[in-house]
Amino acid sequence: MGGRMRALQFHGGHKAQIIDTPRPEAPPGWAVVKVHYCCLCGSDLWLYRGKWHGNRYPIVPGHEWAGVVDSAPEGYESWVGRPVTGDLIVGCQGCGPCRDGLPVMCENLIEIGFTVDGGCAGYVAVPITNLYLLPEGMDLAAASQTEPLAVALHAVDRINLRPAERVAVLGAGGIGQLILQSARATGATVTLATDLVAERRKIAEESGAAAAVHPSELPELTSYADKVDVVFEASGDPESVVRALDLVRPGGRVCLVGYQVGAEHALETARLPLSYASLVGVMGPGGKYREAVDLLANGAIDTQPILTDIVTLDDYAPAIDRAINRTDGTVRVVFDLRNE
C-alpha cells in the first residue's frame, strides 16, 4: 500500500480543512477502497457545525460514497478493481441490539465517517463484509446515493406502505426526494410534498408529487377523504411533526425520518390518541443496500435531479455553505475524488 492522499477533515464549530495524509491501512478483515464520489448529507452538516453526537474530532466525514476496491483481505482478492459502495454501520455482533438485528443501535457502534474516518478522501477503509458489489459500468456518482436510498426504502418498508395509498412527504431534501420516488415505485400516490426551497418543490413535482407547497401554505384537510394514509416527515422540523398529524387520516401512519440535533418537539402527546394514528421512527439503512443498488442500477430511481453540486475538494468551503443555506438550488453536494 503506502502512498498519500488528500481528505476533507472536520473539527467541529464550523471548522474544516483539506489535509494531506497517508492512505488508510486496512485492519484484518477490512478492505481499502479508492473513492470516486462521496456525498455530504444533513448529518455531515451537523458534524461540521460541531453538534452531532457519538463522533470524534478531528474526523474525515463521508458515509455516502462509491468507488473501486484497491486492496482486499484474503479470500476476497477477486474484488480488487471492482466497483463497490458500503454500509457505514459496523456493529459488534455481540450486544443485544446486534443479536436482535438492529446493528444501527449497537452498544459498541463503529460508524464510518463519524467514529472512524470516512469517504471524503482519496481512499477509505471498510470491513469487507460491509461492501456491496456494483454492476460494472454503473454510474458511481449515482451509486453514492445507495445509503440514503436504503434509508428511504427502510422507511417505506417499516411503515408498510401499500400500493394505491395516498402519501405526503414533508421535507423535499435528498432523503425526502428519495422517499418520494420510493413511495411511487411501490404504487403509492404522492399527493403532497412540502419544502422551504422553491427549487426543491419543483423537483418534487417533476418527480411525481401531485402538488408541492411551502410549509406555510399547507392546505387545511378537514375531511377523511382529503387526508392521506401515510405521512413521511423528512425535515426534522418539530412543527412539521405536528403538521403531519393534521394531514394523516384516522388510522393512518406517520413515519419520522428527519432528524435535527437538539430540536425540541412541540407535539402534545394527547394528539396521538386523538388522531388515532401510528407514529413510527426510522434510523439508518435497515439492511436495504442490495435493494437500493438494484433500483439505482436499473434506473427505477433517478438521482440526477438531486445531485445538484458535483465539486472537487478544493471547492469544499463554498459547497458546504450552499448545502447549509440551501442556496442556488443545492440539494446534494457530491465530491469528485477520482484524482485525490
Curated annotation (Swiss-Prot):
Cofactor: Zn(2+)
Cofactor note: Binds 2 Zn(2+) ions per subunit.
Protein EC: 1.1.1.329
Binding positions for Zn(2+) 2 per the UniProt entry: C92, C95, C98, C106
InterPro entries: ADH-like_C (IPR013149), ADH-like_N (IPR013154), D-isomer_DH_CS1 (IPR029752), GroES-like_sf (IPR011032), NAD(P)-bd_dom_sf (IPR036291), Zn_alcohol_dh (IPR050129)
A Pfam family the protein falls into: ADH_zinc_N
Residues annotated as binding Zn(2+) 1: C41, H63, E147
Keyword presence, Manganese: no
The keyword Zinc is assigned to this record: yes
Pathway assigned to this chain's UniProt record: Metabolic intermediate biosynthesis; 2-deoxystreptamine biosynthesis; 2-deoxystreptamine from D-glucose 6-phosphate: step 3/4; Antibiotic biosynthesis; gentamicin biosynthesis
Reactions performed catalytically: 2-deoxy-scyllo-inosamine + NADP(+) = 3-amino-2,3-dideoxy-scyllo-inosose + NADPH + H(+); 2-deoxy-scyllo-inosamine + NAD(+) = 3-amino-2,3-dideoxy-scyllo-inosose + NADH + H(+)
Enzyme class name: oxidoreductase
PANTHER family with a match to the protein in the record: L-THREONINE 3-DEHYDROGENASE
Function (record text): Catalyzes the oxidation of 2-deoxy-scyllo-inosamine (DOIA) with NAD(+) or NADP(+), forming 3-amino-2,3-dideoxy-scyllo-inosose (amino-DOI).
Family of the protein in this entry: Belongs to the zinc-containing alcohol dehydrogenase family. DOIA dehydrogenase subfamily.
Descriptive protein name: 2-deoxy-scyllo-inosamine dehydrogenase
